Amino acid sequence: MAEVTFAKLYKNVVEDFRGDIFIEYFENGNKVQWSKEKFMQITDSLSAYFAERLKNVKKGTWVGICCDNSPYWVSIFFALEKCGYCVAMLNCSFTAEQVNSFSKNLGIEAVIEDNYERAEKLDVKELIMTDDLKKVSVNSEYNTSDEYWETKTAFVTSGTTSNSKLYVFSAESITEQIYYITAQKHAYDKMYGDKIHRFLQILPLRHCLGFGTAMALWVFGYTAFFPDNIGVLTIIDTIRKADINYMVGVPAIWKAIFSVVRIKTKSKVITEQSFRAVMGDSLLSGICSGAKAEETLIRDFRNLSLEIINGWGMTETGIAMVGFFSDNTSYNYTGKILKGSDYKVAFEDENGNISESGTGELLINGNCLYSAVLTEEGLVPRKDEWFHTGDIFENIDADYYFKGRCKSVIITDSGENLYPEELEESFCEILSDVPQFCIACYQNCPVLFIYAPEAEKTVLEEKIRCQNQELMPDKRIAGVFISENPLPVTTKGESSRFKLAEFFESNKKYFNTIILQKGKLNL
């Protein structure tokens, strides 16, 4: 049987699109519309352009897309896959050093770029700017058969050069995931599916959540609207002006919207009336996922007629669970495993026992997971074994309830997984003379705990602040807690990471606290 290529996803999403307008956006204040036919013409033209421009780049190798969302992003993706290149979706917030690191380890010889300053520092054979692609004449036709379409792509998690990770997915896996998402009849009916016409594309298409939800919404026949930027005021203005019915966002985006509603209506409580006064009447439904939604945010949703989908997934697993906040009264309810998918789910308790029900760390296996991960030794295929998600869930009659994170993982408000051990490496050099230091989770934020009786506190604070600013925003610690007394340790003599929050709460008067990010910690 022939291997599934991205031609199948292209057919399902684009060729079989049943709506009238595929993409919309504002340009110089005027609305621009792309029909399905125009989108396909642009994709074919870019395919012809890439076939000539990348003729010295071997087919079957990797090409990086390192650019922000734009109406052209998806055309670029499909055009490259159509030409026989595997697309690596790089984080557009990466530095040139990070892009070069991935290019070297993955063998990337060409990069599609939209940042001229970063582009000057890239070390690749072919560098193509998105501004040049927008000038490609839309009259070329690139004929290809399925044998030239590629079979894989890769999502890259954000982070520093040392800890960013790249996961490869097969075209078959992604196509199946999109199919199972769109096959949820209950979800379609509950989200007012037949009344939705236009969704706002604000999540990065390079991310599995942004990519997967956009593809699924196109399968439903909805128009994707690309805003000028993703500032909260622009989002609100676009929802009103462009008649947006659906929006996918992480909790931080929804919280920002509700904050504006509260300010503009001078009301602490979100009501249907106050929400519509600011947002208008067009928004009917949406998704709030990518991170755990706080109880206050869920209460705000429940005060509205909006039907908001919760859910769960990771870069490594794609979208695995789907559920509505209104389906269950529990604030910890996450949803059900995607029906029909190839996911196998189990739990591992604190003693290492694995079972199919109960409470414990969520384990997942199946073809819907990533197929390979990039290491310093190159791409390493995933073994057919349980993948440890780092999340604790309880399974009650196939309903999944989020109970917390595994001890070593911190999840940020924007949905990023932070690994304390990796963060500590960033501070090792400047804290080499400190007797004890450890990064732990406090109020869902990474905090640096220190015991340094002999250190000059002012100098130490300045070093930490400078080092923290060197990290990407989602990787920065929220504060520093300097203790007058030794930190608790394990039987191995190591700082007891999982007792630090409790230790701080019981001994606050012996701590000097330094806030590094305003609004993150409530002290």
Feature map (PLM): residue ranges:
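Conserved pre-ATP/AMP-binding loop-to-beta segment of ANL
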Residues: 19-21, 135-156, 162-163, 189-198
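Conserved AMP-binding/adenylate-forming
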Residues: 32, 49-94, 201-202
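Conserved AMP-binding A3 loop
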Residues: 33-36, 152-179
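Conserved AMP-binding/adenylation subdomain of ANL enzymes
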Residues: 175-198, 205-274
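Conserved ATP-binding loop and adjacent catalytic segment of the adenylate-forming AMP-binding
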Residues: 225-227, 297-360, 364, 369-372, ...
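Gly/Ser/Thr-rich phosphate-binding loop
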Residues: 245-249, 258-330
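Conserved ATP-binding/catalytic segment of the ANL
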Residues: 361-417, 441
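Conserved C-terminal "lid"/linker of ANL adenylate-forming enzymes
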Residues: 394, 410, 438-441, 466-523
